[in-house]
Every structure is written in C-alpha cells, then in structure tokens.
Amino acid sequence: MSKVVVCALYKFVELPHFESLREPLQKTLEDNGIRGTLLLASEGINGTVAGSREGIDAMLAWLDQQPGLDKIVSKESYDEDMPFYRTKVKLKKEIVTMGVEGIDPKRVVGTYVKPSEWNALISDPDVVLVDTRNDYEVQIGTFKNAVNPKTDTFREFPAYVKENMDPAKHKKVAMFCTGGIRCEKSTAYMLEQGFEEVYHLEGGILKYLEEVPKEETLWEGECFVFDNRVSVNHDLQKGEYDQCHACRMPITEEEKQSEHYIQGVSCVHCVDKFTDEQRQRFIERERQVQLARSRGEEHIGAEVLSAVEKHRLEKALEKERQRKVREAKAN
C-alpha cells in the first residue's frame, strides 16, 4: 500500500474564535510532518492534508480535543509521493465559497444518503442527478446520467439553479461532489429555494469509491482531486491525468502530445487565453521549477500560481465565459 495518507476533512460548526486556532493548528501540522491546506472560518473547518499514518492520526487526535472539532469525519486515499509542497492554515470568510448570505448547513441541509444506498436512489427515473462540481472536474469523471451544470466556480451554482431548475418540476433532486462539503451548501440553498426532496451523497465521491465495489459502481471515469495527484481511480490511487500548470486543467497523455502543449506554459485548453507577458512569466516559472528539481529541491511554483497570476487567470477565464454566453445568446 502507498505510504502517504491523504486526508480530506470538513465540519460545519460555530467557531467564534477560529482565528486563535490558526497558530496551534499550524504547529500541529508541522510537528507531525503534514503538508497541505486547512481553512478555518466562523462556520467551521475544511481542507485536505497528507502525511504518514502516525502524523495524520496525531492531527486528528489534536482536532478531537478542540471544542467543536471533535468527531470530524474524514476521507482517506493514498499516494506513493507527498502530493503537497507546503503546510498552510488559512483564515477565511467561508470554508467553501458559494457567495450566498444566510446559507447555514447547520440549520438546514439535504437528506444524507450512504454510499451503499446511493445506486438505488440515482437509478430512480424520477430523480434528477446533479453534479455540483466545476466543469473541468466533471470532464474526467462523473456518475452515470448526471447533469453537468458546466460551472467554472461554485459561486455560479446558485445562478444555474435559478435558470435551469424548478421546484414544481424537479420533485426529487440528488446531488454529489468530491468529499461532500459543496453539497452541504448546495442542498441547503435548494431547500431555501423551495425544493422539497433534496438528497446528497454522504462523504462524497471519495467515500463512494472507498465503499462501493467496482463491480457494482455507477461511477464512470476518474475523480479530480485538488492536489498534485490531479485525479484518483476507483481504488483511490493516483489516476492517469496530469495537469497544465498554466490553467490548472486536467490533461491526458494524448493532449500532452499536442503542438499547443508546452510544459508549465500552455495546453489545448488555454493556448488562446493568456497574453505574451503572462506566457513569459510562465516560462520563467517553469525554468525555476526545473532548476530546483535538478538541484533536488522543491519549488512552490509547481503547486500554485502567484496571487497576481491567479487573479489574472481568473479574469481571463471569466472573459472567456462571458464571450461564450454572448455567442450562445446570439445564436
């Protein structure tokens, strides 16, 4: 079995003094050799980290001793290598960003469905199955017959519901996401909008892949994950996808053979989305990454874009999305 344990966790709970948890949690992670990112907000905790079996157990034991953070349910998968470069504990307004005020999964939330009961639910012809993840995640794997809202970010999901779903028409709705957290808010939002029967997969796709045998699965493809593995297969081992470090899209080995693919600079998904100035920054970043690797060092540029580059990328992608919307309306 792979030696690195990758642990995804979250819990919605009132943490009025969440700021005071950042430093001791950061120290706990560092002392136990754990890397990855955890988010803290007044509404709870969320994130994915990785480390040894002993390190992850020590972190979970520490969390269990903190008021409100006991009994956190986590999902585990495995990797041969450490999938993160750094250790970060961040303070946020939300632990998963939907951008709708007043949505509180602690107060209102959909009906949880265990992985063992999920197949029966989504096989019901009266159930509308909705994938709440982003379009680039859905492209590499989803459940059979699932609806893809084709959102670029979770913030776009409420608009999708308003424009495409109707409580009077869609009587039963089942939803799923990677680990379950997005469905906590999406189901709460839909109930607030008047939908009566709203279900979601308890523990998300990761828990389903862990518990449901391959011969019974209704999952098709691989599951996108937000770390260096890019995707995991049904065995929760590293999948077949790589990632373009310019636009962060998952790419296949076949797509890497394209003339548009330049490692760290561009791929078939983003070849027309960046300026020459941005490409030059990507080229320099990739040069630094390769130089660090040749020295046996790590370079954080391989993990994330700088804050400025990320902001510019988001603006470029938003412009592209708006262009597609205009074209669709014109047609």
Swiss-Prot record:
Catalysed conversion reaction: uridine(34) in tRNA + AH2 + O2 = 5-hydroxyuridine(34) in tRNA + A + H2O
Keywords: Oxidoreductase, tRNA processing
Xref: Pfam families: Rhodanese, UPF0176_N
Active site residues per record: C177 (cysteine persulfide intermediate)
E.C. no: 1.14.-.-
SUPFAM superfamilies: Rhodanese/Cell cycle control phosphatase
Alphabetized GO MF terms: oxidoreductase activity, acting on paired donors, with incorporation or reduction of molecular oxygen
EC class name: oxidoreductase
GO biological process: tRNA modification
Start and end residues of each Rhodanese domain: 123-217
Superkingdom to which the source organism belongs: Bacteria
Record carries keyword Ion transport: no
Purpose of the protein: Catalyzes oxygen-dependent 5-hydroxyuridine (ho5U) modification at position 34 in tRNAs.
PANTHER family per UniProt: RHODANESE-LIKE DOMAIN-CONTAINING PROTEIN 7-RELATED (PTHR43268:SF3), THIOSULFATE SULFURTRANSFERASE/RHODANESE-LIKE DOMAIN-CONTAINING PROTEIN 2 (PTHR43268)
NCBIfam families, per database record: PRK00142.1-4
Entry similarity comment: Belongs to the TrhO family.
Protein name according to UniProt: tRNA uridine(34) hydroxylase
Organism: Marinomonas sp. (strain MWYL1)
Gene: trhO
